[in-house]
Amino acid sequence: MKSETDRADDRLASLAVVLPLAVAGFVVAAGCWTLFAVAGVHLRSELALSDLQFGFLLAMPMAVGAALAVPAGLAAQKFGARRIMLICLAGLAACMVILLTTDTFPGYLVAAGGLGLAGGFYSAGLQFVTGHCESKRLGLVLGVFGAGVTGAGFNYYLVPLFHEAFSWHGVPLAYLIVLVLVLALLVMLTDPEDAEADPTAETSVRVLLHRMQTRRAGQLCGYFGVVAGSF
């Protein structure tokens, strides 16, 4: 049998592989999430969108991402965090394909809603990385994973460059390539058994609503809402 020290070394070695992959996935997902914040101006002129239509296009990824955060977290508990992360990345890749092929407002609106899968990736990713680390490293691991939100900032620099060099379609094509690459690396380099579902976890809506009624949960939701809203 392995000693406690050996098990700790195994977890640390696993974390050294899992954390960079999870961060890379979140960087790309965050970039997809805010894609229309940069490229939306081009689409607005190309499709001759009204102010209301343009507002819907910008709001859809954020609204869907917020709506998916809790269900994705529950699904990660029930079906496994790794599986939900892979589904979210595959969904984001499908959105890039839609962006490459559509030329209508409804098509772009569907893709914008699909970009909200980035919120689901974030929820599942939190469970994925915390399952590979000890409690004494939890703060550092969560901080490193959360830093993946810098992918949203990269958009403001990289998207205009790709747009000028390759036209608008170069942007979703570049994201599609990176998404497929990260997806393949996650499949090949992570073990499904490391992120199995927890059969003892309570994931019913009733239990969730009961937990949300606690004062502490309400405070944390409020804090995160203010911080995320400011972002």
Predicted regions and their residues:
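A generic transmembrane-helix signature of 12-TM secondary carrier transporters
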Residues: 89, 93-96, 111-112, 176-183
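Hydrophobic core of transmembrane alpha-helices in multi-pass small-molecule transporters
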Residues: 27, 95, 106-120, 225
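Extracytoplasmic
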Residues: 17-51, 69-72
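Conserved MFS/SLC helix-loop-helix module at the cytosolic interface between two early adjacent transmembrane helices
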Residues: 67-105
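Helix-loop-helix hairpin linking two adjacent transmembrane segments in secondary transporters
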Residues: 144-190
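Cytoplasmic helix-loop-helix junction between adjacent transmembrane helices
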Residues: 111-148
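Residue-level signature of mid-helix packing/kink "hotspots" within the transmembrane helices
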Residues: 34, 62-70, 120, 152-154
